[in-house]
Amino acid sequence: EMLDFLSACLRYGVSICVAGATSSGKTTVAGWLLSTIPERKRIFTIEDGSRELQLIRERDGRVTNSVVHTQTRDSENERQRIDQIALLDIALRFNPDIICVGEMRGPEANAAQEAARVGIAVLTTIHSNSSEGTYRRMVSLCKRAVDTPDDTLMGYVTEAYPIVVYCR
């Protein structure tokens, strides 16, 4: 019942952050949630380095859903480097129903919460030691991008992600 509730929230545009320690099942939960999204919804995924989410659905050799998978690319040449912030900017141009940021680890947390606060459903994962500490962790990551008071950022991230799921 809980997973069905979370799936319904995401389908209807509610952003969700899946938190937990390393190997706690965050990506598995996020992948399952995305697999329940109707084929007519446009999904844009952003993954750092390697692709873990497999969301393309096929029927009779034809793709039946609308998914854009993207990955970051590191490079010593700054012009060839593609980070999560750049991919979030690109995602917004695609008019997606859902953006999935594979894992927030740095200043991209600020760009992700901004996207979530303008009406795009954002599904993301984050490393956190507790459910209570998840929003504080988001604030600390956002501060890597902006010099905004903690209480203001706390208001932003709680508005952006009304649901936090903690995996043990």
Predicted regions and their residues:
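P-loop (Walker A) phosphate-binding loop of NTP-binding proteins
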Residues: 9, 21
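Hydrophobic positions on the alpha1 helix immediately C-terminal to the Walker A/P-loop
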Residues: 29, 33
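Conserved NTP phosphate-binding and transfer environment spanning the P-loop NTPase/kinase superfamily
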Residues: 157-158, 162-168
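Switch/coupling sub-region of P-loop NTPases
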Residues: 3, 13-19, 35-158
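Conserved lysine of the Walker
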Residues: 26
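N-terminal pre-Walker A segment at the start of P-loop NTPase domains
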Residues: 1-7
